[in-house]
Amino acid sequence: MNDYHLEDTTSELEALRLENAQLREQLAKREDSSRDYPLSLEEYQRYGRQMIVEETGGVAGQVKLKNTRVLVVGAGGLGCPALPYLAGAGVGQIGIVDNDVVETSNLHRQVLHDSSRVGMLKCESARQYITKLNPHINVVTYPVRLNSSNAFDIFKGYNYILDCTDSPLTRYLVSDVAVNLGITVVSASGLGTEGQLTILNFNNIGPCYRCFYPTPPPPNAVTSCQEGGVIGPCIGLVGTMMAVETLKLILGIYTNENFSPFLMLYSGFPQQSLRTFKMRGRQEKCLCCGKNRTITKEAIEKGEINYELFCGARNYNVCEPDERISVDAFQRIYKDDEFLAKHIFLDVRPSHHYEISHFPEAVNIPIKNLRDMNGDLKKLQEKLPSVEKDSNIVILCRYGNDSQLATRLLKDKFGFSNVRDVRGGYFKYIDDIDQTIPKY
């Protein structure tokens, strides 16, 4: 049996299994209807250990969970732990927004996915996982990129939103739309060994994201998981805490009387710590939830709120075409026996990236260190004794972004004239030239 037929048969078996579970559920409901139980007998067994916890409110609390609709924006490092716990707890409808696909580099932290699903849409992979976990729930997927045009249509009808995204732009959009629709948001982020979590727009009286952050961080201060890395269990713990906070919201643990805005900070290394800080409430001058707000549904949908312009973006395209070379051109000069005699080969990735995998001929000077030299040639010569103003310098980084910035530094600050960066960087070289080099 070939792979195609095997995959087809597996899908058919999965569909039959789900259909069987749904039929059993319908039968159980009919059998229980005469007794007027709010849950099926199987649901009593499934959620029993949860219902006997006094704080959940017993059967009434479980019915609340069953009647609640939660939207999870992002099925990555935060969404992956949050989704199965929400499904396992019995949240009746779960929506998943994500247009990304599963990649091998995701799997160390996004443990809801697995190796067999590489290339599959994350929202579909998540749907398959949580419907296997709990066939009593309804799961809706949105394989689209969230934007000003579709956010209102996607959000409406949901009681709570989990913001599991990794960019300030999307966080502002999620918060703005939620405020306009009167939806409470559980928002979190994580990077490296740390994470943070908060609740926004609680019952339309709590602060929104703009109350906390009226202006976004500068683009060069924002680091993604791809750039900064992340420890799986650390972000997983934050995602699990998001599920806890969502259950507390649904079960009425938080009330208008006892809720106080907070920011929870988690750090996994060197010793684990969890701190909670009291945050300020709604701000009267907030453009989204304040008295004279201008960020309305109409303004967002018409595109009058330019999130890209507001949050900014790092401009990496700072080199002229003749200051860049392709990986093919680099390969030709790299294979020249006199390469090192004619060129200085500089790798500007962070040192711990360089240690994972590098060209043996490359000298590692992270771009941060180059910046700190502030154009001082003597400081550069301490690292590169052979470098002179007329040296031919070839610069490499991970993706071909920092190498452009380094090219500008060496030309504009240090006064070098013969500097070129490798377009696409180290990873482009691996993809196009030599797949035997480790790619991380």
UniProtKB/Swiss-Prot annotation:
Keyword Nucleotidyltransferase: yes
Pathway: tRNA modification; 5-methoxycarbonylmethyl-2-thiouridine-tRNA biosynthesis
Gene Ontology cellular component terms for the protein in this record: cytosol
Gene Ontology biological process terms from the UniProt entry: protein urmylation; tRNA wobble position uridine thiolation
Keyword Cell membrane: no
Modified-residue entries (N-acetylmethionine), positions: M1
Domain Rhodanese: 339-438
Binding residues annotated for Zn(2+), in chain numbering: C208, C211, C286, C289
GO function term, MF aspect, one: thiosulfate-cyanide sulfurtransferase activity
Alphabetized UniProt keyword annotations: Acetylation, ATP-binding, Cytoplasm, Metal-binding, Multifunctional enzyme, Nucleotide-binding, Nucleotidyltransferase, Phosphoprotein, Transferase, tRNA processing, Ubl conjugation pathway, Zinc
InterPro entries listed in its UniProt record: MOCS3/Uba4, Rhodanese-like_dom, Rhodanese-like_dom_sf, ThiF/MoeB/HesA, ThiF_NAD_FAD-bd, Ubiquitin-activating_enz
Superkingdom field: Eukaryota
Entry-linked CDD domains: RHOD_ThiF, ThiF_MoeB_HesA_family
Cellular compartment(s): Cytoplasm, Cytosol
Co-factor binding comment: Binds 1 zinc ion per subunit.
Gene3D superfamilies: NAD(P)-binding Rossmann-like Domain, Rhodanese-like domain
Signal peptide: none
Family the entry assigns: In the N-terminal section; belongs to the HesA/MoeB/ThiF family. UBA4 subfamily.
Main function: Plays a central role in 2-thiolation of mcm(5)S(2)U at tRNA wobble positions of cytosolic tRNA(Lys), tRNA(Glu) and tRNA(Gln). Acts by mediating the C-terminal thiocarboxylation of sulfur carrier URM1. Its N-terminus first activates URM1 as acyl-adenylate (-COAMP), then the persulfide sulfur on the catalytic cysteine is transferred to URM1 to form thiocarboxylation (-COSH) of its C-terminus. The reaction probably involves hydrogen sulfide that is generated from the persulfide intermediate and that acts as a nucleophile towards URM1. Subsequently, a transient disulfide bond is formed.
Stated name of the protein: Adenylyltransferase and sulfurtransferase UBA4
Gene name of the record: UBA4
